[in-house]
Amino acid sequence: CQVVERGLDAXAX
């Protein structure tokens, strides 16, 4: 997963 602008993991999603 990649880091999103939220600062979280994209897979966490």
Curated annotation (Swiss-Prot):
GO molecular function ontology, one term from the record: toxin activity
Expressed in which tissues: Expressed by the venom gland.
Chief location of this protein within or outside the cell: secreted
Subcellular location: Secreted
PTM field: Contains 3 disulfide bonds.
First and last residue of the signal peptide: none
Keyword Disulfide bond: yes
GO CC annotation: extracellular region
Keyword entries, A-Z: Disulfide bond, Neurotoxin, Secreted, Toxin
Name recorded for this polypeptide: Scolopendra 20385.85 Da toxin
Organism the protein comes from: Scolopendra viridicornis nigra (Brazilian giant centipede)
